[in-house]
């Protein structure tokens, strides 16, 4: 068991000045219990905490580090920009055009794109754009999907909202809640019912094509195809939230993987290379409604800043040059097979969901295809499992309802260590 003396001291101090002692709720370890761990350094596939303990990292800053932490080329590019260009100007820069052109080549749906500073900004802006474009007010989202902390999305949400056991948030007005309709993930009839009941009022349907904030739940291809057809029939804007799965499950994201093209796409995480960034883009006829070309307002002081764009550009260039996706698939499949073999040895039959290098081990035997099946997972057992893995030097998400990310820099030795630790942790979860 790692000694966490300094982490405990820092957490007590933090609680005096920061709500709950953290700047994002899931970091507080409320779901799994214990002391939140304060990290001091990350490099490659490893992190070291303030007490000197080292961990094999499967959180990857919640998704951005597909190439590992402190990737040498990305780090060098950031340093060059900081020393020779600057951190921000509040003016247009050439780099904005470079990344916009690159994204339009990589992501099937993107003809025009606007850079922002976070995934939340991207999804909020995309929904506002859809409303402005259609002249309609209501949106459909899916139970358990998380699209950031915008008011419209905190109705039956996933991620930290679900982790804390309350899928709704106080502070969301009744009017906002009334304009947010929730359907069942992977259930097209639930969507059709809402559309029929609100015909002519639905501006957008927003979905994570690989839901990564209720554990990991892949959409069925036929479900996405049906959504596309329904949106075309009803004049509804289809938004894919690819903040997490974009550039992760395939270079062109889930829309490339599934062969289904949305009207708008939101992005983040990997396109910032570990720095704060987001983007939304899509069909030209819709994006031309964004100010200053159109009347749908969106702005940001640090949007398109050189540091974030540098990190994102270098990350995308590496992904294009090295094509890590077959290797990521091999590594993640090795873990999945190893975990399955361990469960067979122990007479367990828990569910594993995986799409590429995004995965989740659910402590339930119920197939997980939506929010209701996800919450059948035994959170207490996951907490024991988490702490056993932590004791063995493996850092997982401190929540049953988050993804496990395999990175390009996880070595075969790292993977073997993880499979061995998984066996011990499964035993510990049942003691």
Swiss-Prot record:
Q: What is its EC number?
A: 5.4.3.8
Database matches in Pfam families: Aminotran_3
- Quote the HAMAP family the UniProt record gives: HemL_aminotrans_3 (MF_00375)
Its recorded name reads Glutamate-1-semialdehyde 2,1-aminomutase
Report the domain of life of the source organism.
Bacteria
Q: For this protein, what is any one GO molecular function term?
A: transaminase activity
Q: What family is it from?
A: Belongs to the class-III pyridoxal-phosphate-dependent aminotransferase family. HemL subfamily.
Recorded hits in SUPFAM superfamilies, A to Z, give: PLP-dependent transferases
Gene Ontology annotations for the cellular component aspect, listed alphabetically = cytoplasm
The cofactors named for this UniProt entry are: pyridoxal 5'-phosphate
Q: Extract one GO BP annotation from the record.
A: protoporphyrinogen IX biosynthetic process
Q: Where in the cell is it found?
A: Cytoplasm
Residue positions where N6-(pyridoxal phosphate)lysine is found in the record: 269
| UniProt entry keywords in alphabetical sequence | Chlorophyll biosynthesis, Cytoplasm, Isomerase, Porphyrin biosynthesis, Pyridoxal phosphate
Q: NCBIfam families in the record, alphabetically? A: hemL, PRK00062.1
**Where is it predominantly found?**
cytoplasm
Record-linked Gene3D superfamilies: Aspartate Aminotransferase, domain 1 (3.90.1150.10), Type I PLP-dependent aspartate aminotransferase-like (Major domain) (3.40.640.10)
**Pathway it belongs to?**
Porphyrin-containing compound metabolism; protoporphyrin-IX biosynthesis; 5-aminolevulinate from L-glutamyl-tRNA(Glu): step 2/2; Porphyrin-containing compound metabolism; chlorophyll biosynthesis
């Amino acid at each position: 068991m790692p000694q966490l003396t300094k982490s405990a001291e820092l957490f007590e101090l933090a609680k005096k000045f920061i709500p709950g002692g953290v700047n994002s709720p899931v970091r507080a370890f409320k779901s799994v219990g214990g002391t939140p761990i304060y990290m001091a350094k990350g490099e490659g596939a490893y992190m070291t905490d303030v007490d000197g303990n080292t961990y094999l990292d499967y959180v990857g800053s919640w998704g951005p580090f597909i190439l590992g932490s402190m990737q040498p080329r990305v780090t060098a590019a950031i340093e060059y920009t900081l020393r020779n260009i600057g951190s921000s100007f509040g003016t247009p820069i050439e780099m904005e055009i470079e990344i916009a052109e690159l994204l339009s080549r990589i992501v099937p749906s993107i003809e025009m794109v606007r850079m922002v500073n976070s995934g939340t900004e991207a999804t909020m802006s995309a929904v506002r754009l859809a409303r402005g474009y259609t002249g309609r007010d209501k949106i459909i989202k899916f139970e358990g999907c998380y699209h950031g902390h915008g008011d419209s999305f905190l109705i039956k949400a996933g991620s930290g909202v679900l982790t804390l056991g309350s899928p709704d948030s106080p502070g969301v007005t009744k009017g906002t809640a009334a304009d947010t309709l929730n359907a069942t993930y992977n259930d097209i009839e639930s969507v059709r019912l809402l559309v029929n009941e609100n015909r002519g009022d639905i501006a957008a349907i927003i979905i994570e094509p690989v839901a990564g904030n209720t554990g990991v739940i892949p959409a069925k291809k036929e479900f996405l195809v049906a959504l596309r057809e329904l949106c075309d029939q009803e004049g509804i804007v289809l938004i894919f939230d690819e903040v997490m799965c974009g550039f992760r499950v395939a270079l062109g994201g889930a829309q490339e993987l599934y062969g289904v093209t949305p009207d708008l796409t939101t992005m983040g995480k990997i396109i910032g290379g570990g720095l704060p960034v987001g983007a939304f883009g899509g069909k030209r006829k819709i994006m031309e409604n964004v100010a200053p070309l159109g009347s749908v307002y969106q702005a940001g002081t640090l949007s398109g800043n050189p540091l974030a764009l540098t990190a994102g550009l270098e990350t995308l260039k590496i992904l294009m040059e090295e094509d890590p996706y077959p290797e990521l698939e091999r590594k993640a499949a090795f873990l999945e097979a190893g975990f399955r073999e361990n469960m067979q040895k122990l007479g367990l039959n828990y569910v594993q969901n995986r799409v590429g290098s995004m995965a989740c081990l659910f402590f339930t035997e119920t197939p997980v295809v939506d929010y209701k099946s996800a919450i059948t997972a035994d959170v207490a057992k996951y907490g024991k499992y988490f702490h056993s893995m932590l004791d063995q030097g493996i850092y997982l998400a401190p929540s049953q309802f988050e993804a496990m990310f395999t990175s390009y820099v996880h070595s075969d030795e790292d993977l073997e260590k993880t499979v061995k630790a998984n066996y011990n942790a499964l035993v510990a979860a049942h003691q």
